[in-house]
């Protein structure tokens, strides 16, 4: 009996254990299913994301390829446009007879870009604001020094095209721009209503400048020529010469420059270690005789080419109410190691020869005024030379 009870108890315990094991197995299986489901879902999400990434990459690659094609097309169009622009520019400028004439057609745009548009407060047509004799009597704080300069001697029309005929009624402007202020320093200026008559026998412009000495440095500076021939009406005016000539230290040589309707010869020289000389000539006694042309020139001890200060061309001596001669030009440059020679001549209108002449020689200084009295037989004259160095303004 006792044995049967023990057997029954063991059977019950075994059944209970079996049920517990079955329950644990069910729970483990359920947990495995949940884990497997989560893993499957995660893998599915990763697969979907990877698929989306691949799609995006494919789309990006397609967009990049499209952009590259568009950029290539734009580059091709830009190249074609540049070639067309160069072709048109070549066609538009094929008339230019020299580089200086070609540069003239672009100079104003170039100048405005580098000077007017950089906050310097200057315009293309402004003339130099630096006067002659700026440092003839320097203040104690001033430190002017000699500089290199451009000595303008002459502008000659050496030839004209067949569509023009001598004499020419010429107007326009010749200027120099230097490093001191980059503004126009007038060499020649005639408005349309005050033309100069240029003949084949005397083809030189009547220069009236510079208003101060023209400085030269290693930086490029510019000579600007814009001359026209007057027609019956403004519409019939013709461009005689348009040039931009560059100059710098070591490169200031006389040159011949062809243009559409003429060829010009610009004669100038490079003066080293110079001072500016401003000349004043005054009639102090006697009078200029009738029938005599007045010609005043200036040069240096080593320069064969004279700068003409005055050529009355006709009878008389032009003076103001105080007897001061109305010189066409009054500013020249002279090296400190040279001498300045001023010559006064009275030329017979009828005989075309020098009847009276006198010459004054000056030793240049860095500053101050030198005076010499001259006599021409029929009158006496005082020659004053004001000397000045320069500061970079």
Spans of model-derived segments:
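Short coil-to-beta strand junction motifs in C2/discoidin
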Residues: 165-171, 288-293
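Long, low-complexity, compositionally biased polyampholytic IDRs enriched for Lys/Glu and Gln/Arg
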Residues: 1-87
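Primarily extracytoplasmic ectodomains and periplasmic/lumenal surface modules that are beta-strand-rich
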Residues: 167-171, 177-182
């Amino acid at each position: 009996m006792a044995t049967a009870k023990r057997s029954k108890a063991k059977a019950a315990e075994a059944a209970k254990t079996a049920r517990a094991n079955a329950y644990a197995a069910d729970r483990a299986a359920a947990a495995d299913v949940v884990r497997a489901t989560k893993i499957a879902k995660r893998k599915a999400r990763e697969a979907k994301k990877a698929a989306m990434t691949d799609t995006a990459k494919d789309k990006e690659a397609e967009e990049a390829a499209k952009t590259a094609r568009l950029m290539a097309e734009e580059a091709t169009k830009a190249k074609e446009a540049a070639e067309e622009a160069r072709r048109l520019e070549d066609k538009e400028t094929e008339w230019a007879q020299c580089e200086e004439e070609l540069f003239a057609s672009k100079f104003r745009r170039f100048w405005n870009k580098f000077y007017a548009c950089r906050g310097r407060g200057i315009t293309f047509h402004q003339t130099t604001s630096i006067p002659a004799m700026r440092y003839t009597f320097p203040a104690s704080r001033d430190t002017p020094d000699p500089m290199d300069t451009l000595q303008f001697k002459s502008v000659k029309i050496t030839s004209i095209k067949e569509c023009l005929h001598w004499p020419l009624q010429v107007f326009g402007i010749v200027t120099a721009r230097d490093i001191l202020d980059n503004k126009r320093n007038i060499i020649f200026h005639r408005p349309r209503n005050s033309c100069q008559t240029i003949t084949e026998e005397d083809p030189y412009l009547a220069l009236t400048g510079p208003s101060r000495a023209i400085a030269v440095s290693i930086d490029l500076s510019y000579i600007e020529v814009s001359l026209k021939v007057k027609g019956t009406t403004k519409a019939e005016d013709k461009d005689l010469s348009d040039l931009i000539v560059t100059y710098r230290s070591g490169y200031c040589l006389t040159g011949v420059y062809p243009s559409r309707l003429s060829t010009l010869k610009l004669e100038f020289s490079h003066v080293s270690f110079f001072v500016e000389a401003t000349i004043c000539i005054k009639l102090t006694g006697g009078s200029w005789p009738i029938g005599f042309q007045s010609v005043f020139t200036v040069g240096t001890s080593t320069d064969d080419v004279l700068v003409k200060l005055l050529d009355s061309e006709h009878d008389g001596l032009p003076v103001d109410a105080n007897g001061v001669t109305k010189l066409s030009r009054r500013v020249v440059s002279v090296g400190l190691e040279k001498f300045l020679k001023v010559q006064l001549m009275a030329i017979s209108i009828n005989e075309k020869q020098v009847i009276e002449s006198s010459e004054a020689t000056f030793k240049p200084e860095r500053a101050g005024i030198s005076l010499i009295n001259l006599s021409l037989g029929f009158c006496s004259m005082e020659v004053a030379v004001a000397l000045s160095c320069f500061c970079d303004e």
